[in-house]
Regions:
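Phosphate- and other anionic-substrate recognition elements at nucleic-acid/protein interfaces
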Residues: 2-3, 11-139
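Conserved catalytic-loop position in the HRD/HxD motif
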Residues: 7
Length: 139
């Protein structure tokens, strides 16, 4: 059983999945959003393929910890998703996850064009790895 993370944006959803031991996060793909039905269908396919038992969704908070418009849209997405996907969902603070992902990609000398295509997936990796590290710390 694995944990999957989602970095939900207005145009894309970055997806990452844990290993079976719940130690490391790997980027899976970036879904280009077209409709909720197609988004949820693809998520269901990935959940089945990776045998996922829990979802972690990045919560885009403001730097002062408050929830803004993007956070409300994420909560709306999750509420609709729960109507078709019956898995526990944990929100995880995603402040600076995209910045950290961008820095990792720059350090790895990934081209600007390639960074743009993988940044959402990498942000999902940062979100999930933070969650997995917390699970290990609390053991």
């Amino acid at each position: 059983m694995r944990i999957m993370s989602l970095d939900v944006g207005s145009r894309t959803i970055g997806i990452a999945c844990s290993d079976a031991l719940l130690m490391t996060a790997q980027g899976i793909e970036t879904i280009r959003r077209t409709s909720l039905e197609k988004d949820f269908n693809r998520l269901q396919e990935l959940i089945a393929e990776y045998e996922v038992h829990e979802l972690v969704v990045g919560m885009p908070k403001n730097m002062n910890g408050t929830k803004g418009e993007r956070a409300k849209k994420t909560e709306e997405f999750v509420a609709k998703m729960k109507e078709v996907i019956d898995l526990p969902v944990t929100y995880w603070d995603e402040r600076l996850s995209t910045v950290m992902a961008e820095r990792q990609l720059i350090a790895a000398d990934v081209s600007r064009k390639k960074r743009k295509s993988v940044i959402d997936k990498m942000a999902a990796v940062v979100i999930l790895q933070g969650y997995l590290d917390r699970l290990q710390f609390n053991k």
